[in-house]
Amino acid sequence: MTGTSSCKDADTDVLDGNLPSIELEYIVKGTESGGIVEVVATYSSVPRDIKIEGRSYQTDEWMNTPSTILAAIPRRLHLQPDHPLTITRKLIESRFPGYKTHNDLFPIVTTRQNFDSLGFPLDHVGRSRTDTYYLNKDTVLRTHTSAHQADTFRSNESEGYLISADVYRRDAVDRSHYPVFHQMEGARTWDREQAKRESKDLAQIIWEDVEKIPKHDIAVEDPNPPFHTERNPLQTGHSPEEVEAIAAHLKRSLEDMVVTIFNAAKSASDTTTDTPDEPLKVRWVEAYFPFTSPSWELEVFWQGDWLEVLGCGVVSQPILNNASVPNRVGWAFGIGLERIAMLLYSIPDIRLFWSSDERFLSQFSEQKPIRRFVPFSKYPACFKDVSFWLKSSSSAAGGGGAAAQAPGTVSSNPSGANNAIPPASPTPPPQSSSFHENDVMEIAREVGGDLIEDVRLTDQFVHPKTARRSMCYRINYRNLERTLTNEETNELHERLRALLVERLGVELR
């Protein structure tokens, strides 16, 4: 059984060009001026040494990062002039004057930076190879901007900072998920020792800073207290007065940012629609994040729905202590740039951010007001199904996405807010006996790249006699720039089927 497929007739004259070549060899092409340079070996025989933008790394059995992911490193969309992510980043930065910005931090970090420094437990699913891209057991592509949090606190160059960067996660394939996306995190801290030297109360100093934040007139729902003993506790060593002041500064700062963002989005929307003017509303919701406490999410009522915009909270004191600034206390937040840009511009598909098509890029300018994105065409989709039996010894696991806590704010130890961060310990070697949905997603991305719009599990069952599990996935192929032919999608789909067998050991149905 080869599965179901459906394709509409193709119009190959829409755009002149060919499908991107599918490299099954583990090669990343670079440029003479730099970029990524990597040669040698096929996927099945992982290269021992790779060089990425002039930096050398040794790989081991943990290596699971395909060349297509490594090739994204030089793109740095958040730094490209007139790119919607750059415009969004600068809009947010404008609301934090005096904060030091870090926008070009290298994406390859140690597991200590990405996990240990934030108190991630050793058994946290975010450490798994099913969720994270590894070069070796000690080196990963950062899964969040918080990988740089401890180092930035340690450098202590400013009271407030903003970090914007590309981050990498093995995840679902659909219009709102991409293995490379962009986050911004911010933090603001105060020095208790300086307050003592000035013979001032720290809470009083923070309240004075609150008064400097621009006022707004939007409706804010915030029914909960600044902290709660059980739901949203204080950390050991933090006084109620300090936390109340820190929470007020955090919330007023982020409300100011959100007002700016959504007023810009409203202006863009007003230029193209006649919808009635609806006043902006925001609300604060108690939350749990492993490296902040107390913690909150900020939601905005937008076009009839409450949308979660960001996560934030009072920084876990062990992070500051281990960064050699135990005298400092403060807050941190994290926000996804693609999510905000999609709202700002009404961009319907996250893959568009990676497009080099002038019909997309020409719609954005840092020198002009924000305008709603106008789709240049909707080319027909082509779906194909693939069904297979798992190996008899395999167990199935879905995509966990555990590392996808609030960007730039958290970890996963319920007591992590008050306890010291544990030292790194030996991690068990990767296991290959179980099936994980993210492996299917990764193979689909490797074969089809941005030509695959989404991948969905449509059916599964266990055979009553053999106890073997059958899975069926629907692959939706769609090019954003031209119509795919049946021949092209058939070729892609056959490659995908072959790789499922080669990599996962499944039996096609």
Give each language-model segment a name.
Residues 1-5:
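N-terminal targeting leader peptides, primarily classical Sec-type signal peptides for secretion
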Residues 7-454, 458-467, 472, 481-483, ...:
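TRNA-recognition modules of translation machinery and tRNA-sensing kinases, especially anticodon-binding
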Residues 475:
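Conformational-control "hinges and anchors"
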Residues 478:
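Positively charged, low-complexity, intrinsically disordered RNA-binding extensions
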Residues 497:
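Acidic (Asp/Glu-rich), glycine- and aromatic
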Residues 506-509:
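Short, highly charged C-terminal tails/helix-capping segments
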